[in-house]
Amino acid sequence: IGFASEAVGRVIPTHSTGSLMLDLVCGSGDRAGFPEGRILEIYGPESAGKTTVCLLAIAARQQEEDQKELADPTYNKKLCIYLDAEHALDLRIAEEYGVNLNELILIDPVTSEDALDVVDELIRSGQIAIMVVDSVPALIPSSVEKASYNQQFMAVLARFMSNVMQKIIGPAHTNGTTIIFINQIREKPGAWSPTG
């Protein structure tokens, strides 16, 4: 606890998004790109390029980690996680965007709770640079799987996401893990689509 004036000089490290234009939109100079240790949400309509932005950010961060390791052979480089809740990631496309699949942890969850327990442990290890969650509507808690989709799906998902945020926001900040949630814009708030 302290006065905000004491923290004025504090700089939040940023990392390239993999796109110069997006870096500049997110900041300027040495503050361009996605902030380290923060939670971000990329949202938009289906096929708007949300996954592409995330794959480019992963590729850029992997290259940055490679450069750090080249400069200092004792450096323990961080990895990236792609939590594919939609079960739709095309790994060939990821590779075309420059993602090193040998250094990408892919989580293809059966239930969201199981996946997020693993993710929480990995983030707390301090060895994760970026985690992408694709996508928020596909994070189906087991309580929803067992129930009818008519039983207030959106309310259950909102409570689940609130619990997720409470669990990961502190460790992500402490360990410098950038977490990117992909979300979609819907015309009908109850509708769900496994793409986007």
Language-model regions, residue ranges each:
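A short beta-strand-to-loop transition that corresponds to the Sensor-1 phosphate-sensing loop
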Residues: 84-86, 135-136, 181-186
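The Walker A/P-loop phosphate-binding site
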Residues: 1-107, 120-124
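Conserved P-loop NTPase "ATPase switch" module shared by AAA+ and STAND
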Residues: 127-145
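Amphipathic alpha-helical transducer elements in NTP-driven molecular machines
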Residues: 15-19, 36, 51-55, 109-117, ...
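Short amphipathic alpha-helices and their capping/turn segments at secondary-structure boundaries
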Residues: 115-131, 168
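Flexible beta-alpha connector loops of hexameric P-loop NTPases
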Residues: 102-112, 144-160, 192-196
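Phosphate-binding/switch region of NTP-binding enzymes
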Residues: 122, 154-196
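Loop/turn-to-beta-strand initiation segments
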Residues: 77-79, 127-130, 174-181
